[in-house]
From Swiss-Prot:
GO terms for biological process: rRNA base methylation. S-adenosyl-L-methionine binds at Q290, Y319, E340, D388. It comes from Bacillus anthracis. It comes from the Bacteria. CDD domains: AdoMet_MTases. Its EC number is 2.1.1.-. GO terms for molecular function: 4 iron, 4 sulfur cluster binding; metal ion binding; rRNA (uridine-C5-)-methyltransferase activity. Keywords: 4Fe-4S, Iron, Iron-sulfur, Metal-binding, Methyltransferase, S-adenosyl-L-methionine, Transferase. This is Uncharacterized RNA methyltransferase BA_0333/GBAA_0333/BAS0318. Pfam families: TRAM, TRM5-TYW2_MTfase, tRNA_U5-meth_tr. Residues 8-66 form the TRAM domain. Belongs to the class I-like SAM-binding methyltransferase superfamily. RNA M5U methyltransferase family.
Length: 458
């Protein structure tokens, strides 16, 4: 006898539902006989009519047709292209509601994935002004009716939505990009056409130093030749004295990858500079640098607090990137060792250490799970281990290395609560106890949340 279950809904069916929760990407979740239906823009507690648009074996997708009751946290999105862009997922939710939803998400995965429901999870540290916080704008360029368009891809497509401004983007970047678009149009620069693999300008990127006010402009082109380059640069430099660097990156490949291999400075310096707290950073076109420096300082201050350094410790910073956390730690530690797999990031880390006259930070290139045991054999004994892995979390070999090395304290910075909970569980099974988790809202109006946890050896 077949045990195959038939989904309790059909495509194009209209049904009334109550939303119970939000998914990790911000969709409302309703259930019919335990069968989940995901609906964009639905909020917990709301009663609504939805239309079923796709039916799968274990779940369905619906479209919100009509609200019967509204959540007290619902609001109109402030961005006119919110429903098309996809850059933000939560503008229809008040900021207070966003912070509560993120806290609930972390509490849920800590229990469900990590079995750590007893660990204190502190409310999210949000922003006083959760707008215009991004210091980097990276926009595709297209052509429409003879003119250039610059903006963002329509959700799920490569159709460019022309945008004059983005409400989460630094106004300085928005203003510059709109003017660059006008100047390029005036000088006859063509936009890259993905289908025909023709045209010149693929993307424009602007990076803004929030503290210094310095701006870097990057042209990403299909060909090395940029027509009327000299006139374009002169006009931009005259109009925007805060632009300290203009760079061209050439990407001739038919690919979705934005950057190519060749980068050339056209004007000014290879770097702009910015500060997070008292630490100065040199930022190149390709450098990884946190896009919300105000909240990055909040995150790093909490990391430093959890590391509880008194000046006598040796600290290892795994996945150290350009050394941003390492240099924060080096302010208080005796010695910091940072490791990162990307060689260019380690060059940036060394440059940033020199820029801040920090001689107690040392950096190595390679996989953390390979380099750290090598250091251990050379006599580097970490009192405190700090990890800040990518979304996939820590490599299993690194977790085993930590358990074998037995640093007294581990501080785990995470951009993915699910992999954080998974990895904390492994560390707990290896002799550690998670003490607390602090959440930081680095990306308001999106579903992303940063966490920092600390564990002690028991």
């Amino acid at each position: 006898m077949s045990t195959k279950m038939t989904p309790p809904v059909e495509k194009n069916e209209f049904i009334d539902v109550v939303f119970e929760d939000l998914t990790h990407d911000g969709a409302g979740v309703a259930k019919v006989k335990g069968y989940p239906i995901f609906v964009k823009n639905g909020l917990p507690g709301e009663e609504a009519q939805i239309k079923i648009v796709k039916v799968k074996k274990n779940f369905a997708f619906g479209r919100l047709m009509k609200l019967h009751t509204e959540s007290p946290y619902r609001k109109d999105a402030e961005c006119p292209v919110y429903n098309q862009c996809g850059g933000c997922q939560l503008q229809h939710l008040t900021y207070e509601g966003q912070l509560q939803a993120k806290e609930k998400q972390v509490r849920d995965v800590m229990q469900r994935i990590g079995g750590l429901g007893d660990v204190p999870v502190h409310p999210v540290l949000g922003m006083k002004n959760p707008w215009v916080y991004r210091n980097k704008a990276q926009v595709p360029i297209g052509e429409r009716e003879g003119g250039l368009v610059a903006g963002f891809y329509r959700q799920g497509t490569h159709d460019i939505i022309n945008m004059e401004s983005c409400l989460i983007q630094a106004e300085e970047n928005d203003t510059l990009i709109q003017e660059v678009k006008r100047i390029c149009e005036k000088h006859g620069i063509s936009a890259y056409n993905e289908e025909r693999n023709k045209g010149t300008l693929r993307h424009v990127m602007a990076r803004y130093g929030q503290v210094t006010g310095e701006i870097m402009l990057v042209f990403i082109t299909r060909t090395a030749e940029l027509p009327n380059k000299k006139a374009i640069i002169e006009e931009i430099a005259a109009k925007f004295p805060e632009v300290k660097s203009i760079v061209q990156n050439v990407n001739p490949k038919r690919t979705n990858v934005i950057f190519g291999d060749k980068t050339t400075v056209l004007y000014g310096s290879e770097y702009i500079y910015d500060f997070i707290g008292d630490i100065k950073f040199a930022i190149s076109a390709r450098s990884f640098y946190q896009v919300n420096p105000e909240q990055t300082k909040v995150l790093y201050d909490k990391t430093l607090e959890y590391a509880k350094l008194d000046g006598n410790e040796t600290v290892i910073d795994a996945y150290c990137g350009i050394g941003s956390i390492s240099l924060f730690l080096a302010q208080k530690a005796k010695k910091v060792y940072g490791v990162e797999i990307v060689p260019e990031a380690i060059e940036d880390a060394k440059r940033n250490a020199a820029l801040n006259n920090m001689t107690n930070a040392e950096f190595g290139v390679g996989e953390a799970e390979v380099v750290i045991p090598k250091w251990y054999k050379e006599g580097v004994i970490a009192d405190t281990m700090v990890v800040d892995p990518p979304r996939k979390g820590c490599d299993e070999a690194l977790l085993n290395t930590i358990i074998d090395m037995k640093p007294k304290r581990v501080v785990y910075v995470s951009c993915n609560p699910a992999t954080l909970a998974r990895d904390l569980k492994v560390l707990e099974e290896g002799g550690y106890k998670t003490q607390e988790v602090q959440l930081v809202d680095m990306f308001p109006h999106t579903t992303h949340v940063e966490c920092v946890a600390w564990l002690k050896l028991v």
